[in-house]
Amino acid sequence: MVSATEKRRYEVLRAIVADYIASQEPVGSKSLLERHKLNVSSATIRNDMSVLESDGFIVQEHASSGRVPTERGYRLFVDSIHDIKPLSLAERRAILGFLEGGVDLEDVLRRSVQLLSQLTHQAAVVQLPTLKTARVKHCEVVPLSPMRLLLVLITDTGRVDQRNVELEEPLAAEEVNVLRDLLNGALGEKTLTAASDALEELAQQAPTDIRDAMRRCCDVLVNTLVDQPSDRLILAGTSNLTRLSRETSASLPMVLEALEEQVVMLKLLSNVTDLDQVRVHIGGENEDIELRSATVITTGYGSQGSALGGLGVVGPTYMDYSGTISKVSAVAKYVGRVLAGE
């Protein structure tokens, strides 16, 4: 059972965190009484602040200044957030409308981080779907001329690759249809690795009259699957980090390096597999030293209950946690809806 004193001290901590997030200035007992309805005396507030400092939730950086939250203080604050303020109907419609304007998967994801960085005023990042999760959805075969075919390979993550195939002998329309059906029969719903194996087998077993054309198509498709780019990130809003307070800006180069080199963020986002959970890593909770002065908020995006990748924001430890968590969660859900065609 939490005592009344403990509840009051949490309210004092909550007020300190809220004021510091708003101003990035140390918070004193006088300003707390002026801004918040704590219904206690100044002496009680000072005593509570002393206890909170002893417990490691706040710190007094200078003898004559007020207190600022520590990472432990932010963690207690975040863990105590139970009611995330939902976005307004107008905000939800604006998000969905902007994302639905994307012409393909990559454009939708690019729009998602642009939107997220604008909504949160932080740097936003999204991981493109990994090859491990991608499956071949369809392969279209379009005759450009009797001696040339266009292959259009589509994965369930929305990636589209187009390749031309030069033929040794012309194909009739009926033969193109047979070739298309055989390719889709071999490729359908397979992972990219399994698809490559299936293509190599198909090239050897195709009917004699289209075997040469099939071999050429399979060679092109195998090379296309092998040449798929490795995991990538899309970034937006890194300029937002330049407005950090003086105390935080000293670590800015390390944070920017982590974002630009991508390896650190890819490792972090690759571990995001839950579509419903928003994770908050505060300062030293981040495994990589480059991010130990920042807060990283992430969640998964995807459709049909399966995560395709992670997205989130990177910013200072004094960010608006409740608002940022709400917006990260909302954008991820709407990305999933757009990808699912809802």
Curated annotation (Swiss-Prot):
Coiled coil: none annotated. Keywords: Repressor, Stress response, Transcription, Transcription regulation. InterPro entries: GAF-like_dom_sf (IPR029016), HrcA (IPR002571), HrcA_C (IPR021153), WH-like_DNA-bd_sf (IPR036388), WH_DNA-bd_sf (IPR036390), WHTH_transcript_rep_HrcA_IDD (IPR023120). The keyword Repressor applies. Pfam families: HrcA. GO terms for molecular function: DNA binding. The keyword Transcription regulation applies. SUPFAM superfamilies: GAF domain-like, Winged helix' DNA-binding domain. GO terms for biological process: negative regulation of DNA-templated transcription. Negative regulator of class I heat shock genes (grpE-dnaK-dnaJ and groELS operons). Prevents heat-shock induction of these operons. Belongs to the HrcA family. This is Heat-inducible transcription repressor HrcA. The gene is hrcA.
